[in-house]
């Protein structure tokens, strides 16, 4: 018997944990960017162009 435990499955478990945590954090950050930042910018742009089209229609 050796005094040190074998490291056979530890690396595999650690790699799977790192990949899972990475995807979870990446998904959370991507969701925050999409719903918290990107959608607000797009809504402002769409409102601007709708207002511009309304003004153009009022001129004609």
UniProtKB/Swiss-Prot annotation:
One of its GO terms (molecular function) is cytochrome-c oxidase activity. Coiled coil: none annotated. The keyword Transmembrane helix applies. Keywords: Membrane, Mitochondrion, Mitochondrion inner membrane, Oxidoreductase, Transmembrane, Transmembrane helix. GO terms for biological process: mitochondrial electron transport, cytochrome c to oxygen. The chain crosses the membrane at residues 16-38. GO terms for cellular component: mitochondrial inner membrane. InterPro entries: Cyt_c_oxidase_su7a_fun. It is a single-pass membrane protein. Pathway: Energy metabolism; oxidative phosphorylation. Its main location: mitochondrion. It is found in: Mitochondrion inner membrane. Residues 58-60 form a propeptide. Residues 39-57 are mitochondrial intermembrane. CDD domains: CcO_VIIa_fungal. Residues 1-15 are mitochondrial matrix. Belongs to the fungal cytochrome c oxidase subunit 7a family. Component of the cytochrome c oxidase (complex IV, CIV), a multisubunit enzyme composed of a catalytic core of 3 subunits and several supernumerary subunits. The complex exists as a monomer or a dimer and forms supercomplexes (SCs) in the inner mitochondrial membrane with ubiquinol-cytochrome c oxidoreductase (cytochrome b-c1 complex, complex III, CIII). Component of the cytochrome c oxidase, the last enzyme in the mitochondrial electron transport chain which drives oxidative phosphorylation. The respiratory chain contains 3 multisubunit complexes succinate dehydrogenase (complex II, CII), ubiquinol-cytochrome c oxidoreductase (cytochrome b-c1 complex, complex III, CIII) and cytochrome c oxidase (complex IV, CIV), that cooperate to transfer electrons derived from NADH and succinate to molecular oxygen, creating an electrochemical gradient over the inner membrane that drives transmembrane transport and the ATP synthase. This is Cytochrome c oxidase subunit 9, mitochondrial. It comes from Kluyveromyces lactis (strain ATCC 8585 / CBS 2359 / DSM 70799 / NBRC 1267 / NRRL Y-1140 / WM37). The gene is COX9.
């Amino acid at each position: 018997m050796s005094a040190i435990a074998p490291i056979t499955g530890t690396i595999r478990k650690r790699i799977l944990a790192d990949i899972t945590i990475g995807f979870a954090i990446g998904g959370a950050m991507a969701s925050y960017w999409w719903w918290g930042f990107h959608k607000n910018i797009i809504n402002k742009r769409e409102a601007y162009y709708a207002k511009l089209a309304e003004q153009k229609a009022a001129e004609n």
